[in-house]
């Protein structure tokens, strides 16, 4: 009987992942593409229901991923070198979990084989977001959903 091989995310560090492995850690929840507000008093970061103009509100996928930085210059491109900064990501985020040495959740597509599980389990904000094109920036505080961290 062959020995069981641990999945790549449990046996490699973030720096050891190839591009395909790195990209596959994304669970497709779209939460990193929600607009965030920082509290000036305690520097806490709060997520809003306001999505980047490029985010598909149903699929939670970027509509122009390859060129996103051209139309959204402040789009954050996650890299393994930023792992110590991942605390602002949701606690369910594959990048954050792996950076913390934790396993992926059962609903993650790399575990269950179903890319829609993130929506069925209501981890994503699919169907519950608004496009930044439809909400004035001054009103974003009215759409806070949770505190990062």
Swiss-Prot record:
It comes from the Bacteria. InterPro entries: Puta_zinc/iron-chelating_dom, UCP006173. Belongs to the UPF0260 family. PANTHER family: UPF0260 PROTEIN YCGN. This is UPF0260 protein Psyr_1567. It comes from Pseudomonas syringae pv. syringae (strain B728a).
